[in-house]
Structures are given as structure tokens and as C-alpha cells.
Amino acid sequence: MSEKWFWLSDWAANMGIWEDDLVEASSESDHTFIAFEQLMKEPKNLYTSIAGLKSADCVVAWGFGSLCLMLSAKDRPAGQKWILLAPVYDFCDEDGGWSVRNVEMLSRQVTKAIKPTLESFLELMGSCDELIQEAWMETALKMNPETLASGLDFLCHNKIEEPLENKGETIVYFGREDQLILPVLAKKISTILPSAKLLERPKSGHWPHTLLL
């Protein structure tokens, strides 16, 4: 019987647009991709709001998706594997390069000037195939600006403060060239997930393709 994999997207992203590439991580498995906008429906209760997530064998969560997943950790089934890509546990941590004030400013800005705001994030995500970057931008521009703003507000006002119970294997991938989630911040996730295996990708930025594949 095939394993079930769920993919939880980052802010302004839908990992499903890269399905053909990403399923290579486990080609024999059944894959379900959850877009950012779907995460925003109940970002602290993913196991309730996303049908089938509780029965998944593996959950891959990228950026914003990882924060939502960890905030929902009380409902994580025993033995469920997590793969966290450039995870966020405290976006405005003093070592992360973001302040609450800056993120709140971007939250206001994205509703008035969506493309310049997205471009400022794109610059921080590191190098990747140009077609991958173009697909991300094209998808993000179609999203509701108010939902994007709410996502930024959520990022700067929610964090994981206590270590999470070890219920299953957890692997963390982070990129040395990621300027959106700095490596120093990614490494600090060991305070929240002390049993997690941390893997640095020296030539990777923020993109799931270069982090995981």
C-alpha cells in the first residue's frame, strides 16, 4: 500500500504547481498538496481543517506551513514523519532579521502594491531555476492580497515557545544561502524540536527543490 504524503505550502505559495518535480522525493507515494490560502482557514488546527492529514505517513511543510504544522502539533499522530523545509518557529526572533514592525509594514503594503512586495521576498529566497521563480510569482499574484496580509500578520504574532513532544521522526532542511529564513534561525529550531535531524544545504536558498531534492 502506498504511503500518503501531504505538502504544506509557504506564505504566498502553492507547492502543487511543482508537483511533477516534488513527487520525486517519494515517487511511489500518494501526494496531496495544500496551498497557502487553504492553510489560512484554520492555521492552528490543521489536523482538523485538512481532511486526511491525520492519516498521512509523512508531512512536508515549507516555511509558513511548518509554523502552522508545529502550532497544530498537539494532534500529530504517533509515528507520523515530518520533513520541515526552511522552518519558521519564531519569524521575528532577534536573530532572524525581521522585526514585528517591518512585517506589519509589509502586511499593509501587500494590499496596495502586491507585486513589489512579492518581489522583495523573491530577492531573499536565493537562486533557483528561473521557471520555478516565475511560477511562484505568477501563482502568488493571483492570491487574495488580504489573505496574504493576514498571513504576514500571523507570522509575526505567532511562535512556538515550548519544546514539542517527540511523536515521530522529524527532519529539518535549511539552506545556507536562504536570506528569508536565515540559517542561524533555522538551526535554533533544535530548542523546539530537540530530537530533530538538521541538514544544511550549502548551495540552497529557500526553494523546496534545492532543499529537498
Language model features: what each stretch is:
Residues 91-137:
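Helix-rich cap/lid subdomain of alpha/beta-hydrolase
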Residues 134-161:
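Hydrophobic, aromatic-rich cap/lid helix
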Residues 60-69:
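Gly/Ala-rich beta-loop-alpha elbow adjacent to hydrolase catalytic centers
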Residues 74-109, 148-156, 212:
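Flexible "cap/lid" loop of the alpha/beta hydrolase fold
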Residues 180, 198-213:
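Catalytic histidine-centered segment of alpha/beta-hydrolase-like enzymes
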Residues 165-166, 172-174, 178:
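Short beta-strand/loop motif that positions the catalytic acidic residue
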Residues 16, 179-185:
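Conserved alpha/beta-hydrolase "acid-adjacent" motif
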Residues 1-44:
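Conserved HGGG/HGGXW glycine-rich cap/lid loop of the alpha/beta-hydrolase fold
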